[in-house]
Structure formats: C-alpha cells, structure tokens
UniProtKB/Swiss-Prot annotation:
Name this polypeptide is given: Restriction of telomere capping protein 5
GO biological process, one term: response to oxidative stress
UniProt source species: Aspergillus fumigatus (strain ATCC MYA-4609 / CBS 101355 / FGSC A1100 / Af293)
Alphabetized SMART domains for the sequence: TLDc (SM00584)
Keywords carried by this UniProt record: Cytoplasm
One Pfam family, short name: TLD
Gene Ontology CC terms: cytoplasm; nucleus
Family in the record: Belongs to the RTC5 family.
Protein function: May be involved in a process influencing telomere capping.
Region (Disordered): 322-343
Predominant cellular place of this UniProt entry's protein: cytoplasm
Membrane-crossing segments per the record: none
C-alpha cells in the first residue's frame, strides 16, 4: 500500500498490495475530476504524517479534518471518531479487506475511502449499493484479520520488491497534467468490468453469499450495539449537513437535553435491528435487511462529510501562475467567529411542532424520500409547512377539513400518544406517522388515478418510537381500488389510512376496516387512534414491515392521542431554479380557497331559506347548497379521500 507509482516488476503484479494500488489509480481517474484530485492531494499531503517517507493520516488528523468529536475532546458527548476511523481503515484496504485490513491511511487508501463513502462507486462497483452495504457491514463488524499463507516464491518476490521500491507516497502519475494514459474516455469499459471482476474474485467482496466459498468466520461476525449506537448518534446530529458545510455547525450546541433526545432516537432505530439470535450483536442478515428496506438513506450523511476531502481552503484559485493552482505554506486555521445558524426544514407558520425535534427530523430523513426526487427528505430541497395541529386548531374534524382538505400538495401526518391500558401491548408512549405524497381529495370515495413510477410517489406508514418500523407503499396496480384509498376522511367515521371503505348505508354506521399489512384509524373526536400491523398481507396499500418476522402475530395498538400534526410538503421557497415562478405555491392556493370559502359563507348568510314551499328563490338557494354538498343526506355525500 505504500508504493507511490505503478511498477511492472516480474512477479509483483499479482500481489494484493500492487493490485490495490492499481485499483486506487482506477478509482481516482474514473470517479474524480482533475480539479477534485488537486484539492484532494492538497488536503491530504498538507496534513499527513511523514514517517520514513511513508505519508499517512492517523485517527486524530482524520477526526480534526472532518470535525468529528472524539475522545480527545474535553467535552465529548459524541465519541464517534474511533468508529469512523475504524470504518475508514477497513474500507482503505478494498478489495482485500480480509488480508490487508486495517490499512494504513495512505493517499491510495483515502482515495478508495472517498469513492466508497461519497457514493461515486457507480463506475467501479457493478452492483453498486448492494456491494456498499456489504462493505459498510464489514467496516463496522468485529472481523479479525485473516492469516494468509504465502508460498516461498511469493515471499522472495515481495522481499525483492521492498528492496527496490521506496516506501513513500507521492501521489499518482495520473494526477500530472499529462494523464492521457488513464483519462481516455474511449477506453473499453468491458476491460474495466473484467478487471474489477477479477479483483472481486480475489477477495471477499462476495463473502456473504450462501455458497461453499463463504468465509464462515466473517459471515458470523456481528456489529456490536455500542458501535452502531455511536454511529447512529453521529448521523442524527449531522443528517442535515450539506456539502462543504462545517460539521461544527451541528456539533457545537450538544447540550444535555439535546443529547438525551439523540440517545432516545438512536435507541428506537437500534430496536429495529434484531439482536435476539446474534449473541447481543447485529448480524449481516439483519443489517442488510433493515438498511436496504427500512432505512434506505441511513448512511447518506457520510457523503457530504467525506466530500470535504475534495475541497481545500488552501488553494487560491483566483491567483494564476505557471501552475494551475497556488498552495499556501500553512494550513488555514478555522475562524473563531460564530458561523451561520444551521438551516431547518421546518418553515415558520401557524404553530411550532411538539413532535418535530431536530433528532426526529434526522430520523425521518433516513427513510423518507423527497416527493420530487429519489434523494432523502433533507437533500431534496423540500420544506415542511405547518398545516394542522390539534394543540392549536383543536380536536375538530371541521377544523381538520378546513386546513387539510384545502391543501393541494403532499402531507406528512405525525401522531404522538400513549398506548391505552386496554391495548394488548400495555402502557407506553408511541409516535406514528404517514407519508402521503399525493394531496387529499374532497370528492367522496375518490382515488387518485396517479400510478407511481418511483418510490418517492408511494405512501408509507411508519412507527418512530418505541421501535422504528416502516410499512412501504404497495406499488402493485391491483391495490388501486375506489373503496381502498390511501387516506380517507369522513365526518361520520373519522380518518382512515390504508383501510377498506364500506359502502354507504342508511340503516347503520359502517366503519373502515384494515386492509393488507397495516392501517391507521382516528376517531371523529381526534382523541383516539388504532394502529394495525401484520407480517402478512400484500393486498392493501401498505406492505409488511421488514422488521417483522413471519412468526410475529398481528399487532393492534389502541392509542390515546396527545398531539396530531399535519405538515405540508412544499419546495424550498429560496430555491428558484426548480420551481415554476408562474405557478402558485400550495400555500397561495390554500389561501385562495380560504378566501373563496369566506365569500361563499357570507353569500349563504344572505340567502333566505325561510320562504314558503314552492318559492323559486328558496328552491334555487337550496339547490345551490345541495350541489355544493353542504346540506342534504344523500349516501356518501360527506367525506373525502386521498
């Protein structure tokens, strides 16, 4: 790993160290621009420790550069530095983790780390995200270094190579201006695939496959709960981090109350990972299942964190000289002046949330997509506009209808309460929610005709606490039925999400019934809710949660509601590039509807309904009100759905 340039010495080509170096060169040319490599080299070499010509980073340098709190800090509520260093040391040995990990953090190792953690692996990993999950598990699991037997010939070759090559890292030849050998865009991509496939076959990139080649010791490895908890707490703090934002913007105000909220949220996420059959640790099967289905954006904070490597404050690109850039002799010291306050996804409005704490928003970003893109909620330039809250607007369906049914955009429903004593699960606080990317409809028993083409357009039902559970939307067209809307509202039965709506009846009041794997119903007083979840059922709006095993029974929780909030999903008002300025925003449309309702209410007050039978004015007025659906008792006239 300390070889600075590619060599073609006889017998040296097949060694893991040399192949790892060649792969690092390929990573650099395929995944970074020349300008990014220039910044990367400056960041690395200006801070690297030089020991006998070998330049590398240690844990302290890595933590200080990234701004991650570690045990060296006097006040250290987040001790995530050792966890990140452990991950980086493992990933730096890719694709020979079993033989070379933990690796010394040379420039070559850091190049591979940056590619893998900034999600630039599309051109070097054939299975992309699936391979990344395996690598992330290995970087966190307690896997020992494998003893590799080498033949005497190989030992002699390595000894000769060590005598002829100086152990120093000077960067890659391809970083020089003349990098035509590796930078040709017309290079045969098939050769790359074959080369990378050969590299994969030499080590454990497919170590978790269920076949005879599986390394049992690695497969049976576990991630300790303490290790994952420290990493989750870091992610909950830096989840809103944007590219090139200083991490201290989010780690400088970690008071006791904030840390308590972060610990609580981390424990609810940890509860999703099954540890019963893993000797107290988290198995690969559980890790892969949860991170790919229930927490698909969990590791997204690593991308902006490690993108700091690709921008150096020491490079003054405004000054031109013979070289392309000018590098200062000293490292720029961070300013002591307070920086800007971190941005928030919650827009100011009619109320302040009692549920959407910063740690809860971070938790939501680990699995909720942006309605306009496949990025997570915090990365998709979306904001949450306050629409309805029982704490402010009261527990009234009339108020709910006035505020929610007039909102012409997607919504996020959040509910917090206590599980009633009558419930089979006893007492305890619970936080539930529903992500509804389509607007509510006021037409009775109507169903959106939109056929979602991606996951961001699908609804989902979730439990945030005491255990993270996600019921994803069912993409099957067969579940799109008029009597099975995603969300339904009625002044007679209340709110129903993921239920089957019964036909209207004059003789009795029929309530919505659960359909499929999950549902949520709220009564007409907005004071009680019922949460239903099953490990089976693919005929409804929601699919079974990944965290539920087939042996678990159906869960039904009766909840006494403390607070229920509805948040509207709107584009970032400050982002004018993605919005159509000629189009009215959902806030403006809602305000226009309210003004129209106010005018109609004033008009109705002026109608004379006290005239005698057969009065044309009275009949016309009554016809107008019936047409608007404000009076009359025709079946199915009251209610609305999504």
């Amino acid at each position: 790993m300390g070889v600075g340039q590619s060599t073609e010495l006889p017998g040296h080509v097949g060694t893991p160290e040399h192949l790892s170096h060649v792969l690092a060169e390929r990573f650099a040319t395929k995944c970074f621009t020349p300008l990014e490599l220039t910044h990367f080299k400056d960041n690395f070499f200006s801070r690297a420790i030089d020991q006998g010509g070998l330049k590398y980073w240690n844990e302290k340098i890595l933590s200080d550069f990234l701004g991650i709190p570690d045990s060296s800090d006097s006040h250290c509520p987040l001790d995530a530095g050792p966890v990140i260093f452990r991950m980086v040391s493992y990933l730096g040995a890719f694709p020979f983790q079993n033989t070379l990990a933990p690796s010394v953090l040379t420039f070559e190792a850091m190049v591979k780390v940056a590619v893998l953690l900034t999600e630039r692996y599309g051109r070097v990993l054939r299975r992309g995200r699936k391979d990344r999950i395996k690598l992330l598990f290995g970087s966190l699991a307690d896997v020992g270094r494998r003893n590799v037997s080498t033949s005497p010939d190989t030992e002699d070759v390595c000894r000769e190579t060590d005598d002829t090559v100086k152990p120093h890292v000077t960067g890659f030849e391809v970083d020089a201006p003349a990098n035509d050998d590796y930078g040709d865009e017309d290079e045969d991509e098939d050769d790359d695939d074959l080369a990378l496939a050969a590299l994969e076959s030499l080590d454990a990139i497919d170590v978790f496959k269920h076949d005879s080649r599986v390394d049992k010791k690695v497969y049976e490895a576990r991630i300790s709960v303490a290790t994952l908890r420290r990493l989750l707490m870091l992610f909950l703090v830096i989840a809103p981090l944007k590219t090139l934002e200083p991490v201290t913007l989010y780690t400088s105000d970690l008071n006791e109350a904030r840390m308590e909220s972060i610990r609580k949220e981390a424990d609810t996420i940890l509860a999703a990972f099954s540890t019963e059959d893993s000797d107290g640790g988290i198995s690969y099967r559980s890790f892969a299942n949860i991170t790919s289905t229930a927490l698909p954006y969990l590791f997204d904070p690593l991308t902006p964190l490690f993108e700091h490597l690709l921008f150096s404050k020491n490079l003054d690109m405004t000054k031109k000289s013979r070289s392309d850039a000018t590098v200062t002799d000293t490292i720029e010291k961070p300013s002591d002046s307070p920086g800007p306050s971190p941005s928030t996804i919650v827009l100011p409005g009619g109320f302040e949330s009692s549920i959407l704490k910063p740690s809860v928003v971070s938790h939501l970003s680990f699995f909720l997509p942006s309605p306009t893109s496949n990025a997570n909620l915090l990365r998709g330039n979306m904001r949450l506009h306050p629409v309805f809250s029982t704490a402010v607007h009261g527990s009234s369906l009339t108020s709910f209808s006035h505020n929610v049914l007039t909102w012409n955009a997607g919504t996020l429903l959040l509910l917090e309460g206590a599980v009633s004593e009558s419930s089979e699960h006893g007492e305890g606080m619970v936080t539930l929610g529903a992500y509804l990317p389509q607007p509510w409809k006021s037409a009775p028993l109507s169903h959106s005709s939109t056929k979602p083409s991606d996951s961001s357009a699908l609804p989902c039902l979730f439990e945030l606490s005491p255990k993270h559970q996600l019921l994803q939307g069912n993409p099957s067209p067969s579940v799109q039925k008029p009597n099975a809307p995603v969300a339904y509202f009625s002044t007679s039965t209340g709110i129903a999400i993921g239920c089957q709506i019964p036909p209207p009846s004059r003789s009795q009041l029929l309530t919505p019934t659960p359909l499929g794997a999950g549902s949520l119903t709220v009564d007409t007083s907005l004071e009680s809710a019922t949460f239903y979840m099953s490990s089976i059922g693919h005929n409804g709006v929601f699919l079974p949660p990944a965290t539920t095993s087939m042996s678990e029974e159906t869960v039904r929780k009766q909840i006494d509601i403390y607070t229920m909030e509805i948040w509207g999903l709107v584009p970032d008002p400050s982002d004018t590039s993605s919005s159509d300025l000629s189009r009215q925003s959902p806030v403006e449309l809602q305000r226009a509807k309210w003004e129209f309702e106010a005018r109609e209410a004033e008009r109705r007050r002026n109608l004379n309904l006290k005239a005698g039978a057969g009065d044309p004015a009275a009949e016309g007025a009554r016809w107008l009100l019936e047409t608007a659906g404000l009076i009359g008792d025709r079946p199915g006239q009251r209610g609305g759905s999504l």
